[in-house]
UniProtKB/Swiss-Prot annotation:
The lineage of its organism: Bacteria, Bacillati, Bacillota, Bacilli, Lactobacillales. This is Aspartate carbamoyltransferase catalytic subunit. It catalyses: carbamoyl phosphate + L-aspartate = N-carbamoyl-L-aspartate + phosphate + H(+). Transmembrane segments: none annotated. Its EC number is 2.1.3.2. Heterododecamer (2C3:3R2) of six catalytic PyrB chains organized as two trimers (C3), and six regulatory PyrI chains organized as three dimers (R2). Catalyzes the condensation of carbamoyl phosphate and aspartate to form carbamoyl aspartate and inorganic phosphate, the committed step in the de novo pyrimidine nucleotide biosynthesis pathway. Coiled coil: none annotated. GO terms for molecular function: amino acid binding; aspartate carbamoyltransferase activity. One of its GO terms (cellular component) is cytosol. L-aspartate binds at residues 80, 165, 217. Pfam families: OTCace, OTCace_N. Disulfide bonds: none annotated.
Length: 305
């Protein structure tokens, strides 16, 4: 890893560090523990709505024995015009050690990490349409548990490619780990940045070949009104319907970062079907975030060897 006290992008992670984090997350899932060198304080600063990521970080922090400080953006001084930098300097000054941050600005963390006075351990909980490293890593853990490897796996990422930070993080890491990528969904959402990672295909043309179907939420809140497509039209043309699921191999799994728009990206009856790993992803997320936090705290000598 390039920055030892922050995990903000999968681009900074080496393949070996990813596999080490997966191994440690799987150990936590089996009951492994760690010991703090002193009381450690955490805060989760989310400037966009979140259920899974925020509560998953909090559960991970509590399982590791951290004291979790509350923060709500709408009742903080951010509502009075305070900058993110000043908010985090305040958090640092009162004695917080670790922060998970979600912010609508892409690369919000660049200026923070360039500031020599900033020494909080930081996990990026999502930046705009940029990166979502913890979601990507829990996805990698879920795939690894299923197949034991990544090399040669065929993965199709389907849905709102243009606005998805999950797509960007996952395509970067999956390609490096040896998977073969395809993209499906409206062709106008497939932009030039995806060309280096895989080809755009019609979903129906590859269903019988893929090992993993990675579905993406349609992010209505990021669309201009002119871009919208009805939910029904999307489901018929690009969604994982029962008819499409029947064409998949018995060993194929499907993932979704959630929240799920049922009967849009995926048919309602498939969300909890035997080949779905959607709720397993959420379960694994706690253990992967434990592994990430432990790694960062070790760099600050806050975890005993």
């Amino acid at each position: 890893m390039t920055n030892q006290t922050a995990i903000v992008s999968v681009e900074q992670l080496t393949n070996s560090s990813v596999l080490n984090l997966i191994e440690r997350a799987e150990a936590f899932k089996q009951g492994a523990t760690c010991e703090l060198t002193r009381p450690v304080y955490a805060m989760n600063l989310f400037f966009e709505n979140s259920t899974r990521t925020k509560t998953s970080f909090e559960m991970a922090e509590r399982k590791l024995g951290l004291s979790v400080m509350s923060f709500e953006a709408e009742t903080s001084s951010v509502s009075k015009g305070e900058t993110l930098s000043d908010t985090l300097k305040t958090v640092q000054a009162i004695g917080v050690d670790f922060v998970a941050v979600r912010h609508p600005q892409n690369y919000y963390y660049d200026d923070l990490l360039a500031d020599p006075a900033f020494h909080l351990a930081l996990a990026n909980g999502g930046d705009g349409s940029g990166q979502h490293p913890s979601q990507c890593l829990l996805d990698m853990m879920t795939i690894h548990e299923e197949f034991g490897h990544f090399d040669g796996l065929k993965v199709v990422i389907c849905g709102d490619l243009r606005h998805s930070r999950v797509a960007k993080s996952n395509m970067q890491l999956l390609k490096r780990l040896g998977a073969q990528l395809y993209f499906a969904g409206p062709e106008e959402w497939f932009t030039a940045e995806f060309n280096d990672y895989g080809q755009h295909v019609a979903l129906d043309s590859i269903l019988d070949q893929v090992d993993v179907v990675m579905l993406l939420r349609i992010q209505h809140e990021r669309f201009d009104s002119a871009e919208t497509m009805t939910d029904e039209a999307f489901h018929v043309k690009y969604g994982l319907t029962a008819q499409r699921a029947a064409q998949l191999k018995a060993s194929t799994i499907w993932l979704h970062p959630a929240p799920v728009n049922r009967d849009v990206e995926i048919a309602d009856e498939l969300v909890e079907a035997p080949q779905s790993r959607i709720f397993k992803q959420m379960h694994n997320g706690v253990f992967m975030r434990m592994a990430m936090i432990e790694y960062l705290l070790k760099q600050k000598n806050l975890i005993k060897d």
